[in-house]
Amino acid sequence: MVDVLYLHRFDPETALDETLETFAMLREQGKIRYLGLSNFAAWQVMKAAAIAMQFDLGISILQPMYSLIKRQAEVEILPMCASEGIAVAGYSPLGSGLLSGKYRRGESGRLSQDERYAARYDDKQMHVAADALGALAEELNTHPATLAVVWASRHPAAPIPIISARSTDQLMPSLNAMHYIMDDALYERLAALMPGPPPATDRSEET
């Protein structure tokens, strides 16, 4: 049995009721436990949730991209999940390795080997933030990857960072995040390294 089966991307060409009916059938057959979504906008999640109710299904977990330098999920995705009781498993907490400091050390990775990833992080502010994170990690005598993973888990929606690595040496700093205590002051200091996304509405100053 599969614990969580994800719809990896919203498909405008396929009716959601057909897809979710299939998920319901798979659950009835004992093949899956929970339904998850990945790379869905907030409105797409709520549309899926409304249709899923027809089949006695719920959206259990959402998998958005989320890191110190990719924070769009803070606008609607993370608040929605907190409101609706949907778990969050954020992927790419290291920004495809940019926040690990490995590119500063001259190591290779997705950003240097894949044009799609290079384009995704082709933003000077992201690279400035990554450099500042590295300097702060040195100041605190820790690894930048540790700080990045802890930061990505500290949002009030309690995201669970999805970590990955090509070697044990790369993996350990991320695992060390489990034991690193980050207070509010450090969390805010890290958050200030990269401008947050604009709010979902244009009159938020009136609230």
Model region roles, listed by residue range:
Residues 201-206:
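Short coil/turn segments at secondary-structure boundaries
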Residues 4-5:
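Acidic/hydrophobic-patterned starts of short beta strands in beta-sheet-rich repeat architectures
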Residues 10-197:
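Beta/alpha (TIM)-barrel catalytic core signal, keyed to glycine-rich beta->alpha loops juxtaposed to Asp/Glu
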